[in-house]
Amino acid sequence: MAHTYCSALFHCVFSTRERRRAIAPEFQERLWAYMGGVARENEMKALGVGGTEDHAHLLLSLPSTMTIAGAMQKIKSGSSLWLHRSCGLTGFEWQKGYGAFTIGCSQIDATLAYIAGQKEHHRKRDFQAEFLSILKRHGVDYDPRYVWG
C-alpha cells in the first residue's frame, strides 16, 4: 500500500495521585478542554474527555506512529503542568499508571455517553469500583494488591 491506514481507539482512564479529590469542579471543564488540545497538538483526536475530582476519562484516536504510553505521557504531563501554572495547583500529580482499553467503532457512542455521565455515575459508585469493573469487562488480568500502588 502507498499509505498507512489505522483505526486505533482507546478509552483511557487515570486518577490523581493517591486518588485525591484534587480537581475542583471550577477547573474541570477547562482541564478537559486543555487535554483535548494537548491531544490535537500531538496528532491525536480526543473524541471525548471528562471525569470527576479524582480521575479522568478520554476517548482517543491515535495515529499509527504513536504508542499508548507516548500518548499518556504527553496528555498527563501537559495537563499537570497546565494545572500547576494556570490554576495554582502546584502540588498536583496524576498517578503513575493508567488504564487503556481498545474499543470498536460501534462502541464510540456508548463510550462517549459513559464519559459524559461521569458526575451522575459517581453518585452511585466510586472510582475504585468503576476501574475494577472496567478491568473485568475488558478481561484484563490484575493482582488486587498492585492496582492502587
Predicted regions and their residues:
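Basic nucleic-acid-binding interfaces
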Residues: 1-149
